[in-house]
């Protein structure tokens, strides 16, 4: 897995409200908040362009981020990101503190391997169906992976991979499976391709049409 460094310089903001947030955006800053753990929530201002560039990386949404302000470094994970409805702009970010020795509760993306070469696709003409694209996990910060890999190379048409089939890295626990066996949901499957019914000659006969042989029999009667 690639090692990416998400280090963000921040400043503590004291002005709050819509007006203050609007002024920040005019200065190419984006408002954010850091909360959770043993500390109080802290309102922050971040460099918009830098954060926007980081948002292009999938790992930004599941990786530990370092926020630097007031001469200290604070580790956190991104919990929410709000975007402008039609402009390529971020409008707000929520970060949750990461504390050493305390488990994180976050979502992890799934990477599906061998989708085009899977047995059920290449040999049987099946179609891959993704039932989920990420999973909810708990994990210690030191064991947090960037994503989970799901290899479907051996799947045939009709086969399904469930949560219990996933190969989990050390220390990773799936939240859904802690709720009971009935939460072992499907992750990915291969289904048979949809076959459209071919139109037959009988299907094309209009309701009022009568085959010639039947018409002749009727005349003889």
Curated annotation (Swiss-Prot):
GO terms for molecular function: 5S rRNA binding; structural constituent of ribosome. One of its GO terms (cellular component) is cytosolic large ribosomal subunit. It holds the Pfam family Ribosomal_TL5_C. Keywords: Ribonucleoprotein, Ribosomal protein, RNA-binding, rRNA-binding. Residues 192-221 are annotated as: Disordered. Coiled coil: none annotated. InterPro entries: Rbsml_bL25/Gln-tRNA_synth_N, Ribosomal_bL25/Gln-tRNA_synth, Ribosomal_bL25_b-dom, Ribosomal_bL25_C, Ribosomal_bL25_long, Ribosomal_bL25_short, Ribosomal_L25_dom, Ribosomal_uL5_bac-type. One of its GO terms (biological process) is translation. Part of the 50S ribosomal subunit; part of the 5S rRNA/L5/L18/L25 subcomplex. Contacts the 5S rRNA. Binds to the 5S rRNA independently of L5 and L18. HAMAP family: Ribosomal_bL25, Ribosomal_bL25_CTC. Belongs to the bacterial ribosomal protein bL25 family. CTC subfamily. This is one of the proteins that binds to the 5S RNA in the ribosome where it forms part of the central protuberance. This is Large ribosomal subunit protein bL25. It comes from Idiomarina loihiensis (strain ATCC BAA-735 / DSM 15497 / L2-TR). The gene is rplY.
């Amino acid at each position: 897995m690639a090692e990416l460094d998400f280090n963000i310089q921040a400043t503590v903001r004291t002005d709050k409200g819509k007006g203050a947030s609007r002024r920040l955006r005019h200065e190419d800053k984006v408002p954010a908040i850091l909360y959770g753990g043993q500390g109080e929530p802290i309102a922050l201002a971040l460099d918009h362009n830098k954060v926007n560039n980081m948002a292009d990386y999938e790992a930004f949404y599941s990786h530990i981020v370092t926020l630097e302000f007031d001469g200290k470094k604070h580790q956190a994970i991104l919990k929410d990101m709000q975007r402008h409805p039609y402009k390529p702009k971020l409008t707000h970010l929520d970060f949750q503190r990461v504390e050493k020795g305390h488990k994180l509760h976050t979502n992890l993306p799934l990477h599906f391997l061998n989708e085009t070469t899977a047995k059920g696709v290449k040999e049987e003409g099946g179609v891959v169906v993704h039932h989920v694209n990420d999973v909810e996990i708990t994990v210690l910060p030191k064991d947090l992976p960037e994503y989970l890999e799901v290899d479907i190379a051996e799947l045939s048409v009709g086969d399904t991979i469930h949560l219990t089939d996933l190969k989990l890295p050390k220390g990773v626990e799936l939240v859904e499976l802690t709720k009971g066996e009935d939460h072992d949901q499907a992750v990915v499957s291969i289904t048979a391709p949809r076959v459209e019914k071919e139109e037959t000659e009988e299907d094309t006969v209009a309701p009022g049409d009568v085959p010639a042989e039947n018409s002749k029999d009727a005349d003889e009667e």
